[in-house]
């Protein structure tokens, strides 16, 4: 079936790196199409890279263009509930995302990962280990390189990180293995509630051969009503069943069906959440027919991703930890649960809270020798959580205030539990700024 047979006009909604990748892909593979781009921002990112012959409308919607479209490719940041998108859907016109276009074009096996937390680390490590096992692999999607740009590479396997937003507009993605890591409250400004959010995540199993789910979080299991009879489930968790953790030779080991694989202490990654992440990677590789034992040396030397519990400065016995990727409550909870701090912890929280309830942090914070530093648009929401809470406007103000007090054994940690869009372009920019300040004051 030629999916493009009746499509003559395509409107791409939202520019940026994803929108540009869509335009490049369409020009290369479907040069006969008329492609137009709408971005409601007055000066969208990437506008200078758009080919001059592509029609562009900025600053508002262009209903006339949408009314003429045979296909609309929307950015994951734009909700399907947006009235202009609903009008398109009511006309019976397909609204897809870049991942759906990737699914139409990909001709090699695909592994995909979703979940509220840990998906970037799992995606990256799966790719690193697959390559170490001799399987040429490309990593992308919601992490780093847009999925469509991966099609330019000569590879044997694709590994994609997928957000719930991307899954909403994806219906044809066939996967050799799919993982749903965990579910915790996030994006409640976009979804009707937790079940709505969960249903978006569960779409990852729609055309998957193997599903990797979390024994410690039953919400990750697909419902039988989804009709995925052919889906083979593989589980991971903190006990010793399937992919899990067992006691061996007097210490904790990662295991498969109660057979030891690797001692937990051999991992460079810190925290219990990262042990779970590694188990998922081992499960995904197994599902894809890759012998993970060939990649264990790569696993042992893997230090994790930038902006994820990353030590950016360590001077005079004071550690500065950049966990800017912690854009929700559960990420910050995970970072704190695996923490080893000899002195006082100076914890920086705040930003764009996305309508979340942060009160579950209170019992964890109560156990720590802590100075809670609250900044950004929703910093006030953290003030009732600890007696030490102090309010600041910007991250720079926090560092300037605390730096004279720091002593050997202390830790300064940015794990904001919030999105960055109130003061930064993204979590990377926020983390980079923190790293700059750390180097300046360390």
UniProtKB/Swiss-Prot annotation:
Enzyme class label: ligase
Positions contributing to ATP binding: 115-121
Pathway membership: Cell wall biogenesis; peptidoglycan biosynthesis
Coiled-coil ranges from the UniProt annotation: none
GO molecular function list: ATP binding; UDP-N-acetylmuramoylalanine-D-glutamate ligase activity
A GO CC term attached to the entry: cytoplasm
Sorted UniProt keywords: ATP-binding, Cell cycle, Cell division, Cell shape, Cell wall biogenesis/degradation, Cytoplasm, Ligase, Nucleotide-binding, Peptidoglycan synthesis
Superkingdom: Bacteria
Family: Belongs to the MurCDEF family.
Name this polypeptide is given: UDP-N-acetylmuramoylalanine--D-glutamate ligase
Species for this entry: Vibrio vulnificus (strain YJ016)
